[in-house]
Amino acid sequence: MSKPPSDPPRRPPAAFAYEDEASEPRNSGRQQQGRRKPESFSENIVVTPDEDDPFINPDSDLIAPPVATPRKRRTSFGKIAAGAFGILLSLGLGLWTDRLIRDLFTRADWLGYAALGVLAIGILAVLALVIRETAGMMRLAAVQTIKAEAEAAILETRPAKARAVLARLTTLLAANPETSKGRATLKATEGEVIDPPHLMALAERELLAPLDRKARALIVNASKRVSIVTAVSPRAVVDLLYVLYEAVRLIRAMAELYGGRPGTLGMFRLLRDVLAHLAVTGSIAVGDSLVQQVLGHGLASKLSARLGEGVINGLMTARIGIAAMDLCRPLAFRTLKRPGIGDFIADLTPSMSPRGNNP
């Protein structure tokens, strides 16, 4: 009778040391020997937050210009003095006209009647001019009123006030054919229940999006013209005069685009508001951020100094256009993105931008 096969002898359990575990004490000993001694630091050290660190957030240097707002109208002693002397000069002009007409009547009746006819035509022309300027000022005031009422209507819970603001906005932009599609879309939503914030966002997308695209094209074209003229003009006076001409032309085109259509006095007031905003924010001078934007695209090494001046003047013209856009736009930027200076660098320097280098 054969015996069953016996199991092979089992190896007793043993512990093994891995290479990492074996080297750990040695490495820890080296680390302990290589540690530096604690030191004290000065209390004047300021830690820069991550959101302000230009190496972590390189786009933080491209600071968007602040939103332009119209200046508050205040009564000053200069305005009172100008009004008083204006009334005095008007009385003197009236007395001179009366004496002139009397003298003409003493010479011949037909001369007196002719002078009266000329005076009547002049008075009618002045009245028409006053009416036109007053209408232009009222249109500019209506734009700011709609903007303020829209901001207040967003905070309401009922859409009645937002609907009223939307009706005024539609009336303001009714003469612009580019808003016809948006007006039809908004008219189709009259029977629907929409919250005021969503209603104003819909109005901004449907009515102002095509106008914003055209406004951006106006700013780009004006900036390009200023850049070219600055690069080829022989005198700095020519640069200054042309920049002023393009600024006035751009501000007027921006006001007419958004339904303002200012007159002569309204244009002066709008120009004063834009220049006051640029002077307060320091946008007239070439600041560090603007220089960084230009030099960051390699213009210092790839362009001549004259062409670099043209690009800087073009960027300043773009800032004027952005400020005019803020003042003339009947709704504040909420749903749509507000343009910044960085959006126009690629248009002024296409060969230096990644978009221009792509085939």
Swiss-Prot record:
Disulfide bonds, paired cysteine numbers: none
Mind telling me which GO cellular component terms the entry cites? plasma membrane
Membrane topology, as annotated, equals:
Multi-pass membrane protein
Keywords from the named record: Cell inner membrane, Cell membrane, Membrane, Transmembrane, Transmembrane helix
Q: Name its cellular compartments.
A: Cell inner membrane
Q: Where is this region: Disordered?
A: 1-50
Xref: InterPro entries? DUF697, UPF0283
Q: Does the keyword Membrane apply?
A: yes
Q: Which domain of life is it from?
A: Bacteria
| Segments crossing the lipid bilayer | 77-97, 111-131
Say if the entry is tagged with keyword rRNA processing.
no
Q: Which PANTHER family match?
A: UPF0283 MEMBRANE PROTEIN YCJF (PTHR39342:SF1)
| Family that this chain belongs to | Belongs to the UPF0283 family.
Its protein name is: UPF0283 membrane protein RHECIAT_CH0002430
Instruction: Kindly list the organism's lineage.
Output: Bacteria, Pseudomonadati, Pseudomonadota, Alphaproteobacteria, Hyphomicrobiales
